[in-house]
């Protein structure tokens, strides 16, 4: 029996990874990454950088991508809960513009592997969340781009958000930085030829 269950999402290139957790009176243990299991599942990746962020409830980050240096990402929540989203922006892909969203939490211990060629973002659902991710290429700030989090063409069903009003269902305001508020819609990026 493998040490993790690797589940292909409906969009090619996206995978949910569920670990096999060994738990007893001392606590628990599980593998968060096993190259042999990943390669056996057809996921041959090489990570160059690990990142960690902490966010309060209502923080929405994204939707980010790098044009010339696309990054694959293996993401998980170390504390709290997040709704994590990947949008297919691969030129010629039959699922271009479609998204997959997954809830990641410290409790479910799921991970989400996002192949290069996707825009990525997440919303913090708990009072606080610590988010960790491994990437396959280095961060290149001059190459960073993004798509509007509420682009109607993509139609992400963000949980616990009251429409596009900028608040969560419990009244918590969305916290989105100025840069992420200014990202264009996918259609505008297509017109400008960014995905050719």
Language model features with spans:
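Non-catalytic, conserved peripheral segments adjacent to functional cores
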Residues: 1-107, 126-128, 135-196
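Short beta-strand His + acidic residue motifs that chelate non-heme Fe in jelly-roll/DSBH
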Residues: 112, 120-125, 133
